[in-house]
């Protein structure tokens, strides 16, 4: 799914490629973690498993590599958690942020990209980069047909 080079990553999807630029000066540990996972091919074969129209697309779960695990998608992790790195950065369209549970220090590998501003996440989720290429791809992913709502909002086709 992702390849990194310096401070950018290419995220390949069924709709095309998106390029995100990291903010290592804002969230160094989160950027380091994402880059390590991407460079170790951790994200290869994963998909965007949760799409909430008008909000965000979420990916990075290693369980999405196996369609037989679909009932558990959204629960996968790399075997560890990282500490939150909250900042003054805003969750606006195209911002890359870490997904987590209700525990602020529970992020590991799952991430999301905002489809529009989500100020209610500001200061509560670790945003660590932004989309610099592929806004049309982001919008296309955000418009795919999904089943379910909220936590269970899954694209009907693999993304």
List the predicted regions and their residue ranges.
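Cyclophilin-like peptidyl-prolyl cis-trans isomerases
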Residues: 1-159
